[in-house]
Amino acid sequence: MSDSMKWKKLGQIITPNKINRNWMITHAMDPTVDHIEGDIFRVYFCGRNNNNQSLIGYADIDINDPQKIIKTPENPILGLGSLGSFDDNGVTASCIVTHKNQKLLYYIGWKPRSTTRFGLMTGLAISNDKGETFKRFSKAPILKLTDREPYSILTAPFVLKDNNDWKMWYVSCEGWEHSDLPKYNIKLATSSDGFEWKQDGIICLNFKNEKETAIARPCVLKEKGIYRMWLSYKNLDQNYRIGYAESEDGINWIRMDDIVGIDVSENWLGLRK
């Protein structure tokens, strides 16, 4: 079991007023980090345009001076899908993996609904130029609706190459309490190549009590044979918090939220719903 963690908040790094781009009029959300070289890291994230639609761009930073942005693209590296597709109203970065000289960007596609607030499905885009531009692997989501997973929230994946296997922990909707309140937990999918995925509907992290309504945005490391997951969770009484869990097999997890070492602030850091 890991010891208690302690995090120091350094404040805002990427904001719309620091980056003057038409794809980033408002918002800088859902950071997804890739190590470039040395102390340089690329933070993929989404801004929102004048139509309040999320588009994916990036900012390169030096980890020793993260307030200074080295580079951002003039245009988004991934825009909206074609009209009527699962990602025609927004795209959000979720995980980036380097594989055979390619960058695989697993992303969230946003789709407005009529009877429920939205659909969120998982897409894949590929870069052959070290992450400067991306092309969709498919116009369809790479996770599929099934009888065990019939709701259109299969999303926010984290992908880990684990020896010869690929593992994906992702958000899966268990149902809607009403049109604006989905309930979702974390499930596991597996793959031999990172492109085609097998969904068994295995619940890895479920709600810890009746009030908890969401477990989301998993991020997983494997150290000394132990899988370590940072996650987000919320319940009916509070907004999102960061949680933590550990597993020996990647399937059965023990929640250890009390040792995560970070909580909400009184300023902007505590406002995310």
Protein language model regions, located:
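Carbohydrate-active catalytic/glycan-binding domains of CAZyme proteins
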Residues: 1-273
